[in-house]
Design a protein with these regions (language model features):
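Acidic-glycine-rich active-site phosphate/pyrophosphate-binding loop
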Residues: 1-14, 64-70
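Helical "substrate-binding/catalytic lid" subdomain
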Residues: 16-135
Length: 135
């Protein structure tokens, strides 16, 4: 695995890696909706969205999504790095695991609904950053 991955960790016995991936997808879902809302706010209040991304990229809001996908959202570049339809699948798995653990994550459920709406509009093969089209 070290041949194709920079960050390799054993998180426990079989199945724990899957749960770790779900944690990643849950956090990413929150980052994506926050990024979309932040960029919408920037735009509606007259800020330059690209300058705003550059400004906050070194602060507490910094994330891989902000740095890599924020500019693509602003430029309306929805070429896939990770397909919407695949992200929906992961979010569905995460929600199923939440249900099995008696855990309610309303933000996760809401973000999944936005992505499902995007897919219903023909965006299933777009990149996850195309979420900006839904709001």
């Amino acid at each position: 695995m070290e041949t194709y991955a920079r960050n390799v960790h054993l998180n426990g016995p079989a199945g724990k890696g899957q749960h770790t991936k779900m944690v990643n997808q849950i956090v990413l879902a929150g980052n994506m909706i926050g990024l979309v809302e932040g960029l919408l706010y920037a735009s509606k209040t007259g800020l330059d969205p690209m300058l705003t991304i550059q400004t906050i990229a070194t602060g507490g809001a910094s994330s891989t999504a902000l740095i890599n996908l924020g500019p693509r959202m602003v430029n309306r570049n929805f070429d896939p790095g990770f397909y919407v339809e695949h992200f929906i699948k992961d979010l569905e798995i995460a929600l199923e695991e939440c249900s099995a653990a008696d855990l309610c994550l309303p933000n996760l459920a809401l973000v999944k609904q936005f992505y499902v709406a995007l897919k219903a509009q023909g965006g299933g093969r777009l990149g996850s950053q195309s979420l900006v089209q839904v709001l």
